[in-house]
């Protein structure tokens, strides 16, 4: 048969190289089992509403009115919606050129970008320029836009933390770049060692790779740690000395579960460092409506802010953004509402504060329940989830399991996670999908299942793990820590 213009053999090699473990083999098998009638608990993706988190009322009211502006003319609208939601809907509609169905500026609505800049200034105490803020279809799209500008070919390297969120490895592969790993220290609660960074850069350069940028994920995904101010300062100095663009993935900044180490933005630390750092270090920071107590993953709202990028570079990024014409307009309004929520004295404030506080307090309790649950299991060790939405326990696998995985043609942690899925319906992501040190195995699960279901889920995991360890324990030891 004649070769088709597009088949697997003629596919772009970069497409074939890119992998995204969060929706990989485990997810596909979980979907098959669900179709067969098995109850599946999808803890593989940070997707709060899919696991029962209720949407915040106020933003849904505002966007509902924006989607159906004829309701604003209904004489009964004041009986169905609070006055502040009505006022905000009118405000956002006034920013558009024809409602939510009309394209916006390719950078996003100027009025919403102004709200984002004001939010950043309140958070950090330093000015923010709306002209250097682009609204995007989720933070992921923004990350892809910036990496597309940084990566010129496979000779360009991006420093990425390992374990890492596979958005980065997949996008770098897709764009034809080279991922340069730097390993986080699990024994130090996934801390970052600058000496390790220097070693990673030196090794990459010895192989002819030009390291162009560095990624930090704060709070961490999948590792759940919060970077200290001192650590961020070290990173910024490192980027200054090595002339690297810093990409600050800060999408989990609302998800903080301990008081000792609050979220501090890279922009704030950079500005506090003063000249020459504050004038020279190039920083792009990302945020989203998908995480925190909003959890509006399906809305696809995000932004990035650029610091110290030359005007001509910003113009080129704008040009490329213009190819897609406009980010999702309703998502832009969600972003405006996230950075400018109801304030004390507003009609909707009490309900908004009650709902958001309730979600965060429940997430904090669930983080503790899951950490304690994992640490009660045989051959499982888990650092406390300081932030984000995930637990990342290490599983010490018996040598019998390593042998069985090899015979099955599976990576050991994939083998374990598949067995867990088949036995319990819990769909996780194997640590190998995020990168890990050789011979060490993990899995990632979200802390998002309903709080009242968490004890049963952890009991189910413990029962499976005990049986797995017994079945494959051949008295020849376990994988290393």
Curated annotation (Swiss-Prot):
Q: For this UniProt record, give its keywords in alphabetical order, as a comma-separated list.
A: Aminotransferase, Peroxisome, Pyridoxal phosphate, Transferase
Q: Which catalysed reactions does the entry list for this protein? A: L-alanine + 2-oxoglutarate = pyruvate + L-glutamate; glyoxylate + L-alanine = glycine + pyruvate; glycine + 2-oxoglutarate = glyoxylate + L-glutamate
* Residues forming coiled coils: none
Q: Which GO terms describe its biological process?
A: glycine biosynthetic process; L-alanine catabolic process; photorespiration; response to hypoxia
**Enzyme Commission designation:** 2.6.1.4, 2.6.1.2, 2.6.1.44, 2.6.1.-
Q: Which residues carry this modification: N6-(pyridoxal phosphate)lysine?
A: 291
Subcellular location field: Peroxisome
Q: Could you say which cofactors this protein requires?
A: pyridoxal 5'-phosphate
Query: What name goes with this protein?
Result: Glutamate--glyoxylate aminotransferase 1
> Which top-level enzyme class is recorded in the Swiss-Prot or TrEMBL entry?
transferase
> What is known about its induction?
Down regulated in the dark. Slightly induced upon low-oxygen stress in shoots.
Per the annotation, the residue ranges of the short sequence motif Peroxisomal targeting signal are 479-481
Pathway field: Amino-acid biosynthesis; glycine biosynthesis; glycine from glyoxylate: step 1/1; Photosynthesis; C4 acid pathway; Amino-acid degradation; L-alanine degradation via transaminase pathway; pyruvate from L-alanine: step 1/1
Checking Gene3D superfamilies in the record gives: 1.10.287.1970, Aspartate Aminotransferase, domain 1, Type I PLP-dependent aspartate aminotransferase-like (Major domain)
Could you name the domain of life of the organism this protein comes from? Eukaryota
A GO molecular-function annotation: mRNA binding
Which residue ranges does UniProt annotate as crossing the membrane?
none
Q: Name one GO cellular component term.
A: chloroplast
Organism source for this protein?
Arabidopsis thaliana
Q: Phenotype of the disruptant?
A: Reduced growth. Loss of alanine aminotransferase activity and increased light sensitivity alleviated by addition of sucrose and rescued by high CO(2). Higher H(2)O(2) levels in light conditions. Greater root growth in low water potential and upon NaCl-stress.
Organismal lineage: Eukaryota, Viridiplantae, Streptophyta, Embryophyta, Tracheophyta
- Name of one Pfam family that matches: Aminotran_1_2
Q: Tell me which tissues or organs this protein is expressed in.
A: Mostly expressed in leaves, and, to a lower extent, in shoots, stems, flowers, seedlings and green siliques.
Assembly, in brief, is: Homodimer.
